[in-house]
Every structure is written in C-alpha cells, then in structure tokens.
UniProtKB/Swiss-Prot annotation:
Inducing stimuli: Up-regulated in response to caloric restriction in white and brown adipose tissues. Up-regulated during cold exposure and down-regulated in higher ambient temperature in brown adipose tissue. Up-regulated after beta-adrenergic agonist (isoproterenol) treatment in white adipose tissue (at protein level). Up-regulated in response to caloric restriction in adipose tissue and kidney. Up-regulated in response to oxidative stress. Up-regulated during postnatal sciatic nerve myelination development and axonal regeneration. Down-regulated during preadipocyte differentiation.
Organ and tissue specificity: Isoform 1 is weakly expressed in the cortex at postnatal(P) days P1, P3 and P7, and increases progressively between P17 and older adult cortex. Isoform 1 is also expressed in heart, liver and skeletal muscle, weakly expressed in the striatum and spinal cord. Isoform 2 is not expressed in the cortex at P1, P3 and P7, and increases strongly and progressively between P17 and older adult cortex. Isoform 2 is also expressed in the heart, liver, striatum and spinal cord. Isoform 4 is weakly expressed in older adult cortex and spinal cords. Expressed in the cortex.
Organism, as annotated: Mus musculus (Mouse)
Domain Deacetylase sirtuin-type: 57-338
Record EC number: 2.3.1.286, 2.3.1.-
Source domain of life: Eukaryota
Matching PANTHER family: NAD-DEPENDENT PROTEIN DEACETYLASE SIRTUIN-2, NAD-DEPENDENT PROTEIN DEACYLASE SIRTUIN-5, MITOCHONDRIAL-RELATED
Name of the protein this chain belongs to: NAD-dependent protein deacetylase sirtuin-2
Localization terms from the record: Nucleus; Cytoplasm; Cytoplasm, Perinuclear region; Perikaryon
Organism taxonomic ancestry: Eukaryota, Metazoa, Chordata, Craniata, Vertebrata
Gene from which this protein is expressed: Sirt2
Keyword Glycoprotein belongs to the record: no
Motif Nuclear export signal location, chain numbering: 41-51
Residues noted as binding Zn(2+) in the record, renumbered to the chain: C195, C200, C221, C224
Effects seen without this gene: Tissue-specific knockout of SIRT2 in Schwann cells of early postnatal mice leads to a transient delay in myelination, a reduction in the nerve conduction velocity and hyperacetylation of PARD3. The number of dividing Schwann cells in the developing nerve and alpha-tubulin acetylation are normal. Mutant mice embryo grow normally and new born are healthy. Embryonic fibroblasts (MEFs) display reduced cell proliferation capacity, centrosome amplification and mitotic cell death. Nude mice inoculated with immortalized MEFs from mutant mice developed tumors.
Length: 389
C-alpha cells in the first residue's frame, strides 16, 4: 500500500482526525471530544469541497422589515431573483403541481401515459401533437405580466438587479421589460425554435411558431420536414449553457437572493439557492415554505445550502407566505416603491391593451386600491396561510 503523502491536505487532515480519536479515547470528556471531531469533519468537508464561508449575520431581524432595511443599506447592491410558475399564476397561467388547478392535474384529455410525458423529449419526437395542443392554450402573448414581473423590472430600474433566473417559459419577463442580458431562462423559451433533426437544426422565429400552433398544424421544418420544437428544455435535455456560465459568475458576488413562486423541486435550478455565499440573505415569497435543509447533510457538512427559517441557528432566511403579487406589494410598500410599482403595472397593462386592441384587463392582476398586506411576521404569515387553506 502506498505511503501517505504529507503534502496531500486530505492525508494531513485524516491524520489529525486519527489523533483526535486517540486523544478522545483517553479522556473522560468523550462527548466533548466527539463534538470537536464532528466540527473538524465539517471543516474538512467544507475545505475539501470549497464550500466554506463566514456565516455573518447581515439582517437585523428575520422579517420582511429586516430584509427591507438591508436592501436600503450600502451592503445590498446586487440582487438575484429566482422565480418559478407561481409568479405567473395570477396572469392565468397554471403552475405544474397544484393538486386541482396545476397543469399536471388537467392533462387527462391528451391521453398521456403519465402527465410528465408531455414534456419528455423522447415522447415528443414520437407524439408531438399533445404538446402543441397544450401550447395553444398556454402560448406567450395571450397573457400580461404580473405585479411580480414588474417588481423585478423595478429592481432593474433601481440598479439593484444582477440577474433574474427563471424556470418559466412564458417570456413574461421579457414582456415586462427585462432585456436578454438580465435573464437566465433556465428551462428555455418560446422566443426561438429549432428543427429537432440534429443534422439540420434550422432556426425559426416566435412569429413562425405562433402561426403554426394557432393553425393547429404540427410545425414541420421547411428543409427536412422534421418536427420543429420551441427552445424550451424538455425532460431528457440539457439546460442552456448560459445557465452554467452565468451561475459561475453571478453567485460569488450576490448580496441578496429573492426566491418567488417556486417549489424548488427541479434540479439543477433548485440547487441555485446553495450557490450564494453563506452570509447572503435569502427571501422566499411563496405560498408555502420550500427548499429547507436536509438535517443530516446540514449536520455532517455544515452546509448553508438549504433554507433554514425556523431553527435556533437561522440567521439569513426569511419566508413571506402568501400570494406572490401581494408579497411583492408588501415589500415595495416597505421600500417606499408601492405607488411607483402600481403606476408601472397600470401603465404597462394599458400599453399592452392598446397594442392588442383589447381594453379588458386580467382581473387577477388588477391592483386592489386597498392597503397591501402587512409585513410578514411569523404570526401574520401563519394566519394568512390558514385563511387561504
């Protein structure tokens, strides 16, 4: 067997672990020694995997008010938003997993072998018709951006938005005024389409695809007659390279994560919450708490990856539970941006109506003239959740 290399940090660390074990066995403080050994193992994991960082507390309290004061300070200059289907439901676009109203719960008419098949690339290549029938119902351009979308735009206008990472394929972030450089469309977009034939890959515009979908004709490549698919990421396909390149550059310098309308169940998007420095505060605006730490991994590796809202060690994670639009209004109110946000939504919706020739607003995105919900202290959040249920 090869001799240990003293220059190898893993060998050195392993030797120290053995020394700690030997020392512990000779003392009456075995419990204390065991704790020291666990601390050492945590350090070993974090150093070896490059996960170590200082757990500095930057929020003076773990509430929406605490997040607001931090956002108004000099420490908060770069905000990343991580968003999912929950920010678009008030525009009339269903999310995926809600038991009765979610997309997966309403696919019986397509006679699929299982709900997820409609977004599997292998099934799509053989049976594209169900996807395009669904796409007609959900096609971008039929919906208006929500208060959440315009709150993200307001972050951009205030010079605070570093990037918006979205799981959504509805392009409403673009409609709301975000530029391509502001976005990472992690699960792709309807903005462009390509032939699925790998030897062809001809590109098509959003307008071309829309015409095909609304004529109820399966889009076929004009060169090779293969199916043309919007550039959204199906199960079994890789995420866009931009997702990984931006992740590497963005998360080392982020000052605040705002996570909205996502179950944080789909990887690798869900793992983004663990990419920020351990001191970076994280605000969740959602109907329920998501993304919590696995207790065993948290103990063994000292990871700050999962969200920790309730333990005694919580120091940076805040949950505002309720409707995402109302959460954005509550935060905007505390920041002194509420009127500006409401005016922006009304003005942009009026412009969309004028361009489409329609004067009927989306009822679910119409702003109530009443006061926005109070900032979410735990008791208020719990009461709000119970009322919704």
């Amino acid at each position: 067997m090869a001799e240990p290399d003293p220059s190898d940090p893993l060998e050195t660390q392993a030797g120290k672990v053995q020394e700690a074990q030997d020392s512990d066995s000779d003392t009456e403080g075995g419990a204390t020694g065991g704790e020291a050994e666990m601390d050492f193992l945590r350090n070993l994991f974090t150093q070896t995997l490059g996960l170590g960082s200082q757990k500095e507390r930057l929020l003076d309290e773990l509430t929406l008010e605490g997040v607001t004061r931090y956002m108004q300070s000099e420490r908060c200059r770069k905000v990343i938003c991580l968003v999912g289907a929950g920010i678009s439901t008030s525009a009339g676009i269903p999310d995926f997993r809600s038991p009765s109203t979610g997309l997966y719960a309403n696919l019986e008419k397509y006679h699929l072998p299982y709900p997820e098949a409609i977004f599997e690339i292998s099934y799509f290549k053989k049976h594209p018709e169900p996807f395009f029938a669904l796409a007609k119902e959900l096609y971008p351009g039929q919906f208006k951006p929500t208060i959440c979308h315009y709150f993200i735009r307001l972050l951009k206008e205030k010079g605070l938005l570093l990037r918006c990472y979205t799981q959504n394929i509805d392009t409403l972030e673009r409609v709301a005024g975000l530029e391509p450089q502001d976005l990472v469309e992690a699960h792709g977009t309807f903005y462009t389409s390509h032939c699925v034939n790998t030897s062809c890959r001809k590109e098509y515009t959003m307008g071309w695809m829309k015409e095909k979908i609304f004529s109820e004709a399966t889009p076929r490549c004009e060169q090779c007659q293969s199916v043309v698919k919007p550039d959204i990421v199906f199960f079994g396909e890789n995420l866009p390279s931009r997702f990984f390149s931006c992740m590497q550059s963005d998360f080392s310098k982020v000052d605040l994560l705002i996570i909205m309308g996502t179950s944080l169940q789909v990887q690798p998007f869900a793992s983004l919450i663990s990419k920020a420095p351990l001191a970076t505060p994280r605000l969740l605006i959602n109907k329920e708490k998501t993304g919590q730490t696995d207790p065993f991994l948290g103990m063994m590796m000292g990871l700050g990856g999962g969200m920790d809202f309730d333990s005694k060690k919580a120091y940076r994670d805040v949950a505002w539970l309720g409707d995402c639009d109302q959460g954005c209004l509550a935060l905007a109110d505390l920041l002194g941006w509420k009127k500006e946000l409401e005016d922006l939504v009304r003005r942009e919706h009026a412009n969309i109506d004028a361009q489409s020739g329609s004067q009927a607003p989306n009822p679910s995105t119409t702003i109530s003239p009443g006061k926005s919900p109070p900032p979410a202290k735990e008791a208020a959040r719990t009461k709000e959740k119970e009322e919704q249920q």
